[in-house]
Amino acid sequence: MKPFRFLTLPSCLATMLATGAHAQSPEINFLGAGKQIVWYQDIALTEVQQSQFDKISKDIDYFGGFALNTENGAWGYTTGFFSQDLAEQAAVKICEGNARGRPCRLVAAVLPATVAPGTRNAFGFSKYKEKYYKSEFLPEVKRQKSGRYAAFAIGSRALGYDTNAKSADVAKLKARRNCEKAEAWNRKKSEISVRNAISAMDGQKCRVIEVIGPS
């Protein structure tokens, strides 16, 4: 087994993938190319606000949100999140920070096109993560000797895994820890407003979405 390499991602509930070798296996919703914009408020944006919104609408593989204070024109946006809920909540918190504590309203969200309209996605799985999951994680699982457990975890903006544990609990613990290392690295690279917004929520914590037991 090669040493574990935790993965950092750019400035992002999966459903169940059922195969016979999987002990606890939420189905993973692989999100394809394209995007959709969900408008929550019928508000005309200024030219500057529109240019900022255009930035998040270009990120087609991940989730983003845009919030606005209509009194003073302050705004906040997020992009590159694995989670629709976290992207929207963080956008509101960033906006309220820019608005000096005044309330902000969520104006819009940007979602991958494959997300069904009207559904909520606590975690999404982009094409990038699908490729990593299939080309790195699963092949490494197959190379392990019998009797070993593997786990795969994702957070708001990172992922991690372990494939050589003696029990399911140990595999989950290692996967979460590796994911959290990547989360911490990404938070250091983020703007202070984004770090504060994520830290104020539960979004920086990684969740195990896949556990594979001995076949």
Locations of regions flagged by a protein language model:
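Bacterial N-terminal signal peptides
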Residues: 8-16
